[in-house]
């Protein structure tokens, strides 16, 4: 059966990359008030940002790379994701970006970043790096003191103990806890997912790919994405081919995620790929550039592809972020550090490793954050990804300080949504933002990618959710809990221990995300492997 256009199933139920260009969060936040509170320890103003569903850390890295353009501030990034695999990818990507330049050169870091971040298959050297780094992180997560010593920019103190256990299990799987390609047969999982998504259109998948690219992505502003690179990603999951195609054959385990399913009346954790197979990772770094020459056209065709622009942007971003690695290496020489602080060199970023912290919040805590005084009215900026807009509520709005800003990612580059559905989605975003106590920013530049709001002074809890217009896709379509799975189509699952399993929806209590963490924290051998994704309301 062919998936109808506009179902949203190509987006998937787990996000691995954003569907919007990276933002400098300082440019989106309210201006610094000289008389405002300052961090008494660092004697610098603080910027507290809450990010829901940012998944890949692109906004954080962009903000850090451009810190030298702004007055000195201390950043507190609070990230809230709906699965621990996204938290693990955050940690891996940041540890790669902050890697000591003497251990890994800039080109190697940028190429490794692109492959780990956006490719379903890796080259063996990149896979070896992932295993080594995952093994290190698996040993650091259970030891908070050692973690704080080696990764001072990271804080996991807000996570529950069972979430930390599950996070350790994720890293151990990445490190090769289960040997052999059958532990995560990415190529087969990708093809099975694609077959079910396209249905009877599978044999014409190249035509479908070209239609989605030219009639949707190109029309919506992503003209630099080339037909060949988009078609290659749709077919194989390899977005950035920096070497010969034969070099990419190791499954990228960082794209694996777990889901609770019912098997013979018991709950089991199935591992598979439930991410995006429609848009791709080209939008985040590949359709905009500070260097306008990269966007130049010749005879109406872009001179550079999205992959080339992405590689350039990521390389420049990591070049700026490398300053944090140099500052970290100088911590053992106080006199050198004092000298550099007294007379900073031109071009040196205005931040150091100690001037920002990434805090990870417990899963599914968006509705309860306002109950804690440390979060109530704290954040100057709230960022909400399009896949978690259903979490935007008056309770969440109470966490934003008066005069704070709200940035909502729109579904502009979600190819499964038609134009009228995009307009309905934008209307729902505005209604939810208003109900949460926000008003449209006055003087904000028009954008089809982000909706910008500011906190109303008279906002209060108790507003009701806005009504959904007929024919408008529900915000919940873009992202649902991993447990909200329904039976998989026949023939798309791998039998367990002989015989054909019968997949049924797993009805779980309200604390099911915690239950999932408990199951994933079991020894890796206890995890059931699904050959492909089960059919759900959010992804196929």
Curated annotation (Swiss-Prot):
Q: Name one GO cellular component term.
A: dynein axonemal particle
Keyword list, A-Z: Cilium biogenesis/degradation, Cytoplasm
Mind telling me which InterPro entries this protein's record contains? DNAAF3, DNAAF3_C, DUF4470
Q: Which Pfam families match?
A: DUF4470, DUF4471
Q: Principal place where this protein is found?
A: cytoplasm
Localization per record = Cytoplasm; Dynein axonemal particle
Key word Cytoplasm present in the record? Answer: yes
What GO biological process terms does the UniProt entry carry, in alphabetical order? Answer: axonemal dynein complex assembly; motile cilium assembly
Q: Where is this region: Disordered?
A: 328-355, 485-522
Keyword Calcium annotated: no
Note the PANTHER family from the entry.
DYNEIN ASSEMBLY FACTOR 3, AXONEMAL, DYNEIN AXONEMAL ASSEMBLY FACTOR 3
Which purpose does this protein serve, as stated in its record? Required for the assembly of axonemal inner and outer dynein arms. Involved in preassembly of dyneins into complexes before their transport into cilia.
Family statement drawn from the similarity comment of this UniProt entry: Belongs to the DNAAF3 family.
Protein name (Swiss-Prot/TrEMBL): Dynein axonemal assembly factor 3
Organism for this UniProt entry: Macaca fascicularis (Crab-eating macaque)
